[in-house]
């Protein structure tokens, strides 16, 4: 789950190519995140399905944005811009 050091959580499952792409975008930008495999965490799966009302992955949760559900590279770019600007003090 998210910590003060990793403000982004990506909920995913094995074999999810869009999840891998999103992780690669964040890695390339140097943005830290946690990954939660929904097939191994029943509590997280319930949270994603019942609270977030998400039926597809990836699901990206952060304190500063609405959850990003599904593969939405434009929204991920906004998230990256926000976190990289925050790190540089802009």
From Swiss-Prot:
Keywords: Disulfide bond, Redox-active center. GO terms for molecular function: electron transfer activity. SUPFAM superfamilies: Thioredoxin-like (SSF52833). PROSITE patterns: GLUTAREDOXIN_2. Disulfide bonds join 16-19. Signal peptide: none annotated. It comes from the Viruses. The keyword Lipid metabolism does not apply. Residues 1-90 form the Glutaredoxin domain. This is Gene 56 protein. It comes from Mycobacterium phage D29. The gene is 56.
């Amino acid at each position: 789950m998210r910590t003060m050091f990793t403000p982004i959580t990506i909920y995913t499952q094995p074999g999810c190519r869009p999840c891998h792409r999103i992780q690669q975008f964040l890695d390339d930008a140097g943005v830290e995140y946690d990954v939660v495999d929904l097939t191994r965490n029943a509590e997280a799966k319930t949270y994603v399905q019942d609270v977030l009302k998400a039926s597809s992955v990836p699901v990206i949760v952060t304190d500063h944005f609405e959850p990003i559900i599904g593969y939405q590279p434009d929204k991920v770019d906004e998230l990256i811009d926000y976190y990289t600007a925050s790190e540089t003090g802009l």
